Swiss-Prot record:
Pfam families: AAA_25, ChlI, Zn_ribbon_LapB. A motif (RadA KNRFG motif) lies at residues 253-257. Belongs to the RecA family. RadA subfamily. Its EC number is 3.6.4.-. The lineage of its organism: Bacteria, Pseudomonadati, Campylobacterota, Epsilonproteobacteria, Campylobacterales. GO terms for biological process: recombinational repair. This is DNA repair protein RadA. ATP binds at G96, S97, P98, G99, V100, G101, K102, S103. GO terms for molecular function: ATP binding; ATP hydrolysis activity; ATP-dependent DNA damage sensor activity; damaged DNA binding; zinc ion binding. It comes from Helicobacter pylori (strain ATCC 700392 / 26695).
Length: 448
């Protein structure tokens, strides 16, 4: 008689072990292992089996290839993020917090494609058909070629996709679907992994662009096994406060284009719309205030004008606070230490708070100079002209380094009527912006 083998799986990350573990060695989750039954083990073994290869290896120079066919999503900002549009046969995963606009955006994409006489299927496991139609009426998304399906049974959904010649498909959401062949609840690791694998095969074999909406965990990552993100061609993530109009779409993985671009949307009565004059969303045009400084950051090929806001106040307790929203806290601590060392400013007795307007997160060092200028402005209670921008990276020895692609930043300043720029070196090309050189942090204090 064959010996019975057991297999346990972590419900957080999908890690498998031949014995039960109190703590997952991969994701460090406690008491997350459950024993798989025979059917689940067969599915797992099927997924692990390599696809047999009949052909021999071929020289890469001898392989004939075709360019990836892309088509417009009808949403200009989404096309920018995807690198020029949706690829035929592409599998896209879209995540974001509840209410941020995932379903709204993809319903508008589906409607836009259907308007161009393309047959599109929208599968919802969360809303009834009448609820979806009410939302479609509000968003003006009623199209004859847009088909709705309210179903969570995966074999039924798969049969529907295979029975019709759909151009694209939207799954809302992957965590609500289940396959009867796997005896676990919808949204479990096994269910999500198997159904995503089937969707990947459908997308490639039938040349259908498929969008999957994914829920997120309380830590902010997409719920489900990590293999989910490896299976898909692109991972898109919505950022933004649901209570505000602005939404930012980022690409964390894209097999068909760059991952450095971002898309900017505004939530209006007619749903998510591509933001016009994007830079104007991130800075104030009102009278200048203490603690505010302007900078220009690059997100992919796009230059954005941002307002850095600082608040410096006397410390009420022994240990001062350093908090940043949209800016790296470790880099903020470094800049504060630099001001204390080089300029002898007693920030060790002050709380320092930094905020990047618009809710955007910046990581490029070229914004360092604006952060320092905003801190000095708040500390000295001096206003900075809101037609002046600060561009430059600050090194540990107090020197200011040139921001890359400076001409693109200055051109964006010209478009919005800015007059002056503080930077370490004057630009090589002519510009209407008056550029003032400051190659060290001490020069900023003199200028202020």
């Amino acid at each position: 008689m064959a010996k019975k083998t057991s297999l346990f799986e972590c419900q957080h990350c999908g890690f498998t072990s031949p014995k039960w573990l109190g703590k997952c060695v991969q994701c460090n989750a406690w008491e997350s292992f459950i024993e798989l039954n025979q059917a689940q083990k067969e599915v797992l073994n099927t997924l692990k089996k390599p696809i047999p290869q009949a052909q021999k290896s071929v020289s890469i120079a001898a392989i004939e290839h075709e360019e990836v066919i892309k088509f417009s999503s009808t949403q200009s900002e989404l096309d920018i993020v995807l690198g020029g549009g949706i690829a035929k046969g592409g599998l896209y995963l879209v995540g974001g917090s509840p209410g941020v606009g995932k379903s709204t955006l993809l319903l508008k994409v589906a409607s836009g494609l259907a308007k161009n006489q393309q047959k599109v299927l929208y599968v919802s496991g969360e809303e009834s058909l009448s609820q979806i139609k009410m939302r479609a009426i509000r968003l003006d998304c009623i199209e004859k070629e847009l088909y709705l399906l309210n179903e969570i049974n995966w074999p039924v959904i798969k049969a529907n996709i295979e029975s019709e010649n759909y151009f694209a498909c939207v799954i809302d959401s992957i965590q609500t679907l289940y396959s009867p062949e796997i005896s676990s609840a919808p949204g479990s690791i096994s269910q999500v992994r198997e159904i995503t694998f089937e969707l990947m095969r459908l997308a490639k074999t039938r040349d259908i662009a498929i969008f999957i909406i994914g829920h997120i965990t309380k830590e902010g990552s997409i719920a489900g096994p990590r293999v989910l993100e490896h299976m898909v061609d692109s991972v898109l993530y919505f950022e933004g406060d649901p209570s505000r109009e602005l939404r930012i779409l980022r690409s964390f993985k894209n097999r068909f284009g760059p991952t450095s671009e971002i898309g900017l949307f505004e939530m209006k009565e007619q749903g998510l719309v591509s933001a016009k004059e994007a830079s104007s969303l991130f800075f104030s045009k009102e009278e200048p205030m203490e603690g505010s400084a302007i900078t220009i950051t690059l997100e992919g090929s796009r230059a954005l004008i941002l307002e850095i806001q600082a608040l410096v106040s006397e410390c009420s307790f022994g240990s001062p606070k350093r908090l940043a929203n949209g800016f790296d806290t470790n880099r903020l601590n470094m800049l504060i230490a630099l001001l204390e060392k080089k300029l002898e400013i007693p920030l060790n007795r002050h709380d320092v708070f930094i905020n990047v307007s618009g809710g955007i997160k910046i990581s490029e060092p070229a914004c360092d100079l604006a952060v320092i200028a905003s801190i000095l402005s708040s500390f000295k209670n001096r206003k900075i002209d809101n037609k002046t921008a600060f561009l430059g990276e600050v090194s540990l020895n107090g020197r200011i380094l040139e921001a890359p692609n400076l001409n693109a930043r200055l051109k964006e300043m010209e478009n919005y009527g800015f007059l002056k720029a503080i930077l370490p070196k004057k630009p090589s090309q002519k510009t209407s912006i008056k550029c003032y050189e400051a190659n060290a942090v001490g020069k900023i204090v003199e200028w202020m």
